[in-house]
């Protein structure tokens, strides 16, 4: 029985490792720039160059804009999840305020609430 469970787990792990992972796109390729900051056109492969007047299929500029917005959206989600993990791991930012023994002058009731003068005198706070 244990051997079949072990074999099933190994098979599942093998299938998961073969499945292509959904990786985030890497950094966009850097475009060489001139010292004045203008982009330099990269030379095309032999015979595959396009003329200045030719339009790229799919709208060229729209694809670049979509890629940038998708990258920004992915970064924003990552920031939110990172903040959630930080809050989870660090119990409270002002934890020192709540730690420590009882301070002088604070009377605590039965449930940890501060009692007023009448409740502390008469015992009606509980």
Swiss-Prot record:
GO CC entries: extracellular region; protein-containing complex
ATP-binding keyword on record: no
Compartment(s): Secreted
Cysteines engaged in disulfide bonds, as pairs: 110-126
Propeptide: 24-73
InterPro entries: C_natriurtcpep, Natr_peptide, Natr_peptide_CS
Keywords for the protein's UniProt record, in alphabetical order: Cleavage on pair of basic residues, Disulfide bond, Hormone, Osteogenesis, Secreted, Signal, Vasoactive
Coiled coil regions in record: none
Primary subcellular site in the record, as a coarse category: secreted
Biased amino acid composition, Gly residues: 46-62
UniProt family annotation: Belongs to the natriuretic peptide family.
Protein name (Swiss-Prot/TrEMBL): C-type natriuretic peptide
Gene designation: NPPC
